[in-house]
Every structure is written in structure tokens, then in C-alpha cells.
């Protein structure tokens, strides 16, 4: 506690901007190494988490068209109305816990994780009612009754997974904000190894059919949360940051919501814009071809985004830690290092995709028209990969600094006032069809990246560090004065 008091009273360094000369003293190279050591295993974690979802879909897909269509619709619905919102709300911890760790208020990480679990569990209650009645709702909206019925059953069996997600996401950020990536990598790998045979048994051997895919996913999320919770409780690596359950978790609800709502808005506004493009593709002539091609392109973008997402997570953690410690110069250097990694990754991946544009369509489809259309879209997808890498890291910078509200405004303007209107105009009025839709979402991504870069470039890092220190000083005072009554 004395360390924390000394840390929160330490002065903020006087550096407002980092110059080129500052980047040549070894700090930049050292930061690159830190980010790579963080991002490499984190990328593996992201890929494994993605594959857990894919495995369920692949196994369900072998049951037939109705099972695949209903499961795909249910997963898309649940992602938009639930999982995306839970992930977005939990991103508040990227600011709060990251800066608390930098300020050496270690115990706050455990308290904030419990606060997040409590808030997210409450959010799951109305969401679960929505999922339970999904089948009836989408029939009213005009969906095929057979697909709607089976999709509703699939969503209902995903409800336990939603509550698991409310516990899991704060735990993931609890470890990430301490740069403890090994527990995430080990537990996600173990869960994946369990999920594959579990999903196979439930889908093919239990008689549950496609419902088994949803149940397997829910059970795997609970296993993941239990494993991480056990590591948090028993590991000596978490001895300083874990906290007992006290009334203190309720006192942090207001602060959590302050950052959680704009965090959710920032993430969901971008996520939902891509889902809207898929829906618009269904209104085009030959909707089966257009939707299939755009789905393949978005799936490719999701896979290639794993590395930028890991770099963004590393940047967010490092920046929040340094700002919490009052090191404005170090936080600014992290931005340069993270953007350098993002540029290198974007160029390598986009050029590889462009070079193999006549090949990668075969991975997803055997239909000749689909493969040719995917090859035609490849140059646009390559540009999207570059923009996604840059904006992903810039969004990580925003989370580390606590600018989620600015990011939400930017994403709303870039996609809903600019990108999607352009997409609809090009697709339906200029008759560019799927290409027009992608150009529109690309225009939104360009504006989003430029605005995030402008905000980052105009940032006074000394002021950011001072604000973080003031926030942590208030947190430290409350930690010293509040009474900790057991629940």
C-alpha cells in the first residue's frame, strides 16, 4: 500500500511529444520487443478463440443445409445482440485496470474484474429473454419458419454461454492488463482440445443434432471461465491483484459504466456496420452469390485481423500501464512502435492475399462463379486489411487512453453517415452490386482511420498522463477510506 501511495504521488514526466531523436536512444527498439513478446502469444489466443466458434459451425454444417442455415443465422443474431455488446462493455477494463496496474494499485484489478462480472451478468438478463424468443421474433420479421424455429432453439442453448461470457471477458482482461498472456494461451488451448471431441459427441452421438453445437460452445465457455478463475484464485502470479468479494465491487459500478457504455458503442457500431452490409447484399440480384462472396471476404478479414487485434491489445495494455505510472514519454513511444508493427503486418498479409487471389477462394467454395468473384474482390479486401490493421491499433490506443467516447462518435460518423450511404448508393443506384457495398464500407474505414490518426496525432501525452494519475489518486484515496464489508 505504501508503494501505491508513493506511486500515485509521483510527478508526471515533462515530455509532451516524442521526437525522432528520442526514438533513436534504444527505447523504440526495446518497446518493439515488448510488444512482439506480448502480441505473438496473444495472436495465438485470438485465433484459438475464433477456432472454438468455427469448430461448432463446421460440425453443424455437415448435418445439412437447414442445420447450417439456422445455426449461421442464430450465431449472427447472437453476435450482434449479445456477444458484441458484452465484449464492448468489458473493454472499459482496458482503461481502468490497465491504468490501475501502472499506478501499482494492484488490488484494484481484482475488484474491477468483479464489478465488471456483476454488471455484465445483469446485462445478460434482458439479452437472454431476447435470445429465448428469437425464433418468434424473426418469423414476424419475415424469416422462413423452419429456419426461424431451428435458429431459435440454437440461440436458446447459447444462453448459458452468454452468462459464461459475462464472467470470461473480465477475466481475460484481468490477465491481459497485467501482461499475463501465458495463462490465457494455456487455458484457451486446453479448452480447444476439450471442445473438439465434446462438440463431436454432442452433435453426432447424443441425438441433439445442431443443438449440440450450441451446447458444446456454452460448456466450453464455462470451462474457459472456470480455468481462468481457478488460475486467478490459486496462482502466486495473481497474489497482489486478486481481491476478496466485498461491498467495494458495487462502489465501482458507476465508474465502470462511465467507460463501458462508450466502449460498447465504439465496438458495436463498427461490428454492426459489417453485419448491415451482409443484410444489404441479400437485397441484390442473385443474392445467394452476392451474400456468399461477401461472407467469404468478411471471414477472410476476420481471420487476418487476429494479428492486428493482438497488437492492439498489447498497445492498449502498455499505454494504459505507462499512463497510470505517469510515463507520458513511454506511452507515446508505444504508439510509434505499435503502428510500425501494424504497418509491417498489413503490408505482408495484404500482399500475400493479393498474390494468391486466384487461390484463396477455393478454401471456402468449389463453385466457379464464387471463386472468380472472390478473386475480383481480392484487391479491395487487401486494402481493407491494411486499413483494419491501422485502425485496429489506433482503437487500441484509444482504449488505453480512455477515449472510447471519441471512438464511438468517429465510428458512427465514418460508417453510418459516410460509408454505408456510399455503399447503398454504389450497390443499388450505380449497380456495382457487391463491389459497391465493399467500396462503401472501405470508404468508411478510410475516414475512421484518418480521424483516429488525427486524434492520436494531436494528443498531449503529458495531459493524458496527468489525467490518468488524478484518476488513480482518487481511486487510491477511496481504497484507503472505504470500509470493506464482506458480502
Swiss-Prot record:
Main subcellular location of this protein, as a coarse class: membrane
UniProt entry keywords in alphabetical sequence: Membrane, Transmembrane, Transmembrane helix, Transport
Lipid bilayer topology: Multi-pass membrane protein
GO biological process, one term: xenobiotic detoxification by transmembrane export across the plasma membrane
Molecular-function GO term, any one: antiporter activity
InterPro entries membership: MATE_euk, MATE_fam
Annotated TM spans: 35-55, 73-93, 122-142, 155-175, 184-204, 211-231, 264-284, 293-313, 333-353, 377-397, 412-432, 435-455
Pfam families listed in its UniProt record: MatE (PF01554)
CDD domains to which the protein is assigned, alphabetical: MATE_eukaryotic
Key word tRNA-binding present: no
A GO CC annotation given for this chain: membrane
Subcellular location: Membrane
Assigned protein family: Belongs to the multi antimicrobial extrusion (MATE) (TC 2.A.66.1) family.
Protein name: Protein DETOXIFICATION 10
Naturally occurring in which organism (per UniProt): Arabidopsis thaliana
Upper classification of the organism: Eukaryota, Viridiplantae, Streptophyta, Embryophyta, Tracheophyta
Amino acid at each position: 500500500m505504501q508503494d501505491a501511495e508513493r506511486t500515485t504521488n509521483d510527478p508526471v514526466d515533462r515530455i509532451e511529444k516524442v521526437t525522432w531523436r528520442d526514438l533513436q536512444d534504444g527505447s523504440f527498439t526495446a518497446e518493439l520487443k515488448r510488444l512482439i513478446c506480448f502480441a505473438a502469444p496473444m495472436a495465438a489466443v485470438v485465433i484459438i478463440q475464433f477456432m472454438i466458434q468455427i469448430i461448432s459451425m463446421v460440425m453443424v454444417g455437415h448435418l445439412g443445409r437447414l442445420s447450417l442455415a439456422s445455426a449461421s443465422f442464430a450465431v449472427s443474431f447472437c453476435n450482434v445482440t449479445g456477444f458484441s455488446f458484452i465484449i464492448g462493455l468489458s473493454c472499459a477494463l482496458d482503461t481502468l485496470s490497465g491504468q490501475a496496474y501502472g499506478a501499482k494499485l494492484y488490488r484494484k484489478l481484482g475488484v474491477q474484474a468483479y464489478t465488471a462480472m456483476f454488471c455484465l451478468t445483469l446485462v445478460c438478463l434482458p439479452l437472454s429473454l431476447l435470445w429465448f424468443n428469437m425464433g418468434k421474433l424473426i418469423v414476424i420479421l419475415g424469416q422462413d419458419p423452419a429456419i426461424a424455429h431451428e435458429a431459435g432453439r440454437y440461440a436458446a442453448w447459447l444462453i448459458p454461454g452468454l452468462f459464461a461470457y459475462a464472467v470470461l471477458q473480465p477475466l481475460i482482461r484481468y490477465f491481459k492488463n497485467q501482461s499475463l498472456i501465458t495463462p490465457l494461451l494455456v487455458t484457451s488451448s486446453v479448452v480447444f482440445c476439450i471442445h473438439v471431441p465434446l462438440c463431436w459427441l454432442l452433435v453426432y452421438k447424443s441425438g441433439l443434432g445442431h443443438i449440440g453445437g450450441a451446447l458444446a460452445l456454452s460448456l466450453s465457455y464455462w470451462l474457459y471461465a472456470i480455468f481462468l478463475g481457478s488460475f486467478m484464485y490459486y496462482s502466486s502470479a495473481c497474489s497482489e491483484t486478486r481481491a476478496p468479494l466485498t461491498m467495494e465491487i458495487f462502489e465501482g459500478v458507476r465508474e465502470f459504466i462511465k467507460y463501458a457504455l462508450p466502449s460498447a458503442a465504439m465496438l458495436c457500431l463498427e461490428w454492426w456496420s459489417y453485419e448491415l452490409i451482409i443484410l444489404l447484399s441479400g437485397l441484390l440480384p442473385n443474392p445467394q452469390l452476392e451474400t456468399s462472396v461477401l461472407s467469404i471476404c468478411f471471414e477472410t478479414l476476420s481471420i487476418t485481423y487476429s494479428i492486428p487485434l493482438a497488437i492492439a491489445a498489447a498497445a492498449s495494455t502498455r499505454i494504459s500501464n505507462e499512463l497510470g505510472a505517469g510515463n507520458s514519454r513511454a506511452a507515446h513511444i508505444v504508439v510509434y512502435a505499435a503502428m510500425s508493427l501494424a504497418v509491417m503486418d498489413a503490408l505482408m498479409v495484404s500482399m500475400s492475399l493479393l498474390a494468391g487471389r486466384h487461390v484463396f477462394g477455393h478454401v471456402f467454395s468449389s463453385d466457379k462463379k464464387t471463386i472468380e468473384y472472390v478473386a475480383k474482390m481480392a484487391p479491395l479486401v487487401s486494402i481493407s486489411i491494411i486499413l483494419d490493421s491501422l485502425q485496429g491499433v489506433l482503437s487500441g490506443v484509444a482504449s488505453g487512453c480512455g477515449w472510447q467516447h471519441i471512438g464511438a462518435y468517429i465510428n458512427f460518423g465514418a460508417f453510418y453517415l459516410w460509408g454505408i450511404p456510399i455503399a447503398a448508393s454504389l450497390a443499388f443506384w450505380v449497380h456495382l452490386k457487391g463491389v459497391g457495398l465493399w467500396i462503401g464500407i472501405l470508404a468508411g474505414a478510410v475516414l475512421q482511420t484518418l480521424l483516429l490518426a488525427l486524434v492520436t496525432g494531436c494528443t498531449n501525452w503529458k495531459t493524458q498522463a496527468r489525467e490518468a494519475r488524478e484518476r488513480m489518486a482518487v481511486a487510491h484515496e477511496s481504497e484507503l477510506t472505504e470500509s470493506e464489508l464482506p458480502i
